[in-house]
Amino acid sequence: MDHDLDKFPLLSYVLHQHDSNLHAPPSMAAQETLLPSFPLLSNPEIMSMLTQSIPTTITQTLFVFNSLGSRPDPLAVSSARFKIAQIMDSLSPEEAAKESEIYAGVVRLDEVHDSYEKKLKDTEEELSRVYSTEVESMLRSGEEVNEKVLAVLKEAESGGTVERIDLSSQELKLIPEAFWKVVGLVYLNLSGNDLTFIPDAISKLKKLEELDVSSNSLESLPDSIGMLLNLRILNVNANNLTALPESIAHCRSLVELDASYNNLTSLPTNIGYGLQNLERLSIQLNKLRYFPGSISEMYNLKYLDAHMNEIHGIPNSIGRLTKLEVLNLSSNFNNLMGVPDTITDLTNLRELDLSNNQIQAIPDSFYRLRKLEKLNLDQNPLEIPSQEVATQGAEVVREFMRKRWGDIMAEQQQRIGVEAERHGDENGWVYWGTSMVTNLVSGVTHTIGFGGATSDGGDKKPGDSYFYHQI
């Protein structure tokens, strides 16, 4: 039985058609996604070309792949790498080699799995390319003609200058190979089709500035997308993406990225280090649980929409996004229980939506958001400020928090005076200094980590860290 070939449905299908005794058919689920994407597989000429394209070594590759057994859990591999690093740091090379042998075995097994999966993936992509080429041939001969697609292909092949291609809502199952010859392409719109993948060959479009593949059935983006160094606008919303490739961080010219309406569970770790020119980031309606720390490096970000996710906490470093004007963190429901004090460093913020969460208090330093015009705190168990105050808009909330801040300062000053009298003037100031150092350390402790509960599970007093930082 072939090893997990549902990851490579086209290869599995062609192998079964070639030798049904040796190779099992794809699962029903795989066939349901495969056949709509490759509707002409029943064509004898196409199937013949696909069969001839399969490497002669595929049987040996599958045999070895089957003999490997299950791939190690990613967490186990990560732990093994960590253990090896620890051992290498603490022992001599000879001792380390022996001590780390069992962990090295886990890593090697994972690497072998990765190597063989890459071979199968390459074969899958080659079959897809062959299929595309054969369909194009049919287009040229007048079969299955889509006039708009054919016109684009003819212009591209004639050597004409083509900078913009709009093939939105054309029921495309694949992207014709000839597209990758249009090296001067600046704008490509393939939205509203039935595409399930983007070939690696997209990297040939070096001048591409805007790519719209929204409203398709994409489950992944190719790593080669990171080679589109002139790309300024990327729209991949309304697909089936579970992750964005790490290589997207190389698209340093990106100004707008829309990855909303997908199934993303995380963002690439280094995304912020590369996308420092990004101004708009739309990641709403996904399954994100946290922001990577590097998001604070997106210094030019003006618009961030992350509503309808599963976000548990906001990194304190969000305060570094000082150009941010619109921030929507609404509808993270039971997951988001607080925001860090540093959110008040976003002094250019005009719109803030924190509705439909579990926030009990906003930072006491909230009055610093002087440019805030729109504020939505609905559907939160608010205590500070009260629901009555919160519903009256940004200006009222800002004034309420300004007064509260003044009261806190006055109370602190009065407490210092009382302590000074109680301990004597000199000793009182010593007490005050000790108290302030202790509180400052406490504030820093609260500041490290994410907005919401403290590391020991207790609730943080809103505004404390900012208060002591200011003093």
Curated annotation (Swiss-Prot):
Annotated Pfam families: LRR_14, LRR_8
Positions in coiled-coil regions: 106-133
Alphabetized UniProt keyword annotations: Coiled coil, Leucine-rich repeat, Repeat
Tissue: Widely expressed but preferentially in roots.
LRR repeats: 159-182, 183-205, 206-229, 231-251, 253-275, 276-298, 300-321, 324-346, 347-369, 371-392
Entry's Gene Ontology BP terms: microgametogenesis
InterPro entries: Leu-rich_rpt, Leu-rich_rpt_typical-subtyp, LRR_dom_sf, LRR_domain-containing, LRR_R13L4/SHOC2-like
Locus of motif GVYW: 393-405
Cleaved signal peptide residues: none
Role of this protein: Leucine-rich repeat protein that likely mediates protein interactions, possibly in the context of signal transduction.
PANTHER family: LEUCINE-RICH REPEAT-CONTAINING PROTEIN (PTHR48051:SF54), PTHR48051
Annotated family: Belongs to the SHOC2 family.
Protein name listed in UniProt: Plant intracellular Ras-group-related LRR protein 2
Protein's organism: Arabidopsis thaliana
